[in-house]
Structure formats: structure tokens, C-alpha cells
């Protein structure tokens, strides 16, 4: 979709990179991709799948810096944050990255928590691509709240293709 809209990106954060499919695609027309994936199995696949110039981190991203645990979520490949544990979680703001063109967030319902930890970074971000499905309910949020949060942060919907929405700075 981004190629079709002639959007150009120099610096992208891929939060919830899974096995790197999206990072690989974006790396082909982007200057720098930084990918985050907390699941150890998915992270190993991510590292094997992406080119060397994609920066990878085995970290969860959320609303605070702490250690967490993940559990399997029902019968899917998705993981769920369940409390303290041995996986580091960081906020986007704590990464102290500037000039982000696009933040892509696909974290199986934890999207609102990621946004809460990215308030400062969002001020200088041009686009946010976010997967919005019914998983946000698992963490006490809903899709409308996520959209309102982004509107308040200065974004509007550029285009949507369920379950993804791309927001652009107003």
C-alpha cells in the first residue's frame, strides 16, 4: 500500500516484527529499518530472514521499561504479555530515536500500551501504521480508543485496509 501511495521513508520502526516479512519488504525502499520482536522463536527467524542492514532487537515494546513474560494465546501463534519475567520491555521514548518516518505496530492487542510509551517520539513521527483488530480488548482497550489517542497526538487516518490503518500527521 505504501508504494501505491508514493510514500517515502528513511527511518522505520517495526514493532512486532514477527519473522521479518514486513521488515524485508520495507527495507527494499527505506533507508533504515529497526525491528523489535520479543518472542525467542520468532526472533531467531527474524534474524535469519532480514538483510544485515535491518537492525533487530529481541525486546518487547510497551508503556514502561520492565521485565515481562509471554504466554501462548489460545490456539494462535500470537503471544500475550502476562506479567513479570525474563523478557525485557522498553518504551519507544526510552530508545531516544528521532526523525522516525513510520512506526509500524502489530502487537496482537498491545497497541495502546506501545502508543502510551511513544508519546514524545510521536511528536516527530510522520506516519503510524497499526493493526487494529479485536485483540485490543485483551488489554482493556478498544480500537476507537486507539484512534482517539492518535488523533489527540496529531494524526488522522490516511487509508485503511482491514485490519491495518495508516495514520498521517495532520
Question: Can you describe what each PLM-predicted range is?
Answer:
Residues 1-170:
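Phosphate/nucleotide-binding beta-alpha loop and adjacent structural elements of enzyme active sites
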